[in-house]
């Protein structure tokens, strides 16, 4: 999913940096999952709807964005998130210290034990994005966001579509992921 010429995933890189309750788009979309909304007029409640991307694949989603900073400079950001059923015997995310398992893990630049922030090194981001998508990164004055869902599970996605169409004509685009999406 690619959205160009938008503000992108703005805001601070880590929740520890939040001031005056200004989380920005990055933290709200990527990191604030399973946290109650406390802002007046905020939509949703716990942010669980954001995990819908994880249901069509293996649970891995990459978020890439390029924003224009207040200084006028541009910054690229890349972070990955993995969501799994933490109750499954095959779960991969280990329990951390004495906390309950949440089934959510983030990947990026390690800042300290069990903490990461998005990668901002443009050359590193370019390699990763081109490997996963074959698409170019945002350049020059271009801003926007890409949500990348690698390893879409065709058997999990397409049978649902085909079941809904059993009584009707089976459409060509319901048999190929790239045509369906």
Regions found by a protein language model. Give the residues of each.
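Flexible ATP-lid and adjacent glycine-rich G1/G2 motifs of the Bergerat
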Residues: 1-72
């Amino acid at each position: 999913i690619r959205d160009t010429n938008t503000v992108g995933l703005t805001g601070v890189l880590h929740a520890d940096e939040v001031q005056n309750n200004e989380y920005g788009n990055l933290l709200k979309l990527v990191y604030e999952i399973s946290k109650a909304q406390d802002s007046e007029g905020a939509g949703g409640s716990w942010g669980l709807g954001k995990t819908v991307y994880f249901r069509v694949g293996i649970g891995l989603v990459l978020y890439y964005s390029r924003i224009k900073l207040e200084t006028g400079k541009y910054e690229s950001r890349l972070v990955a998130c993995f969501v799994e059923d933490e109750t499954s015997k095959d779960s991969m995310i280990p329990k951390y210290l004495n906390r309950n398992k949440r089934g959510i893990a983030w990947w990026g630049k390690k800042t300290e034990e069990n903490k990461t922030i998005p990668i901002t090194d443009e050359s590193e981001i370019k390699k990763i994005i081109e490997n996963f998508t074959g698409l170019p990164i945002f350049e020059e004055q271009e801003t926007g966001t890409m949500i990348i869902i690698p390893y879409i599970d065709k058997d999990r996605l397409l049978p649902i579509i085909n079941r809904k169409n059993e009584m009707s004509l089976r459409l060509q685009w319901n048999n190929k992921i790239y045509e369906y999406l």
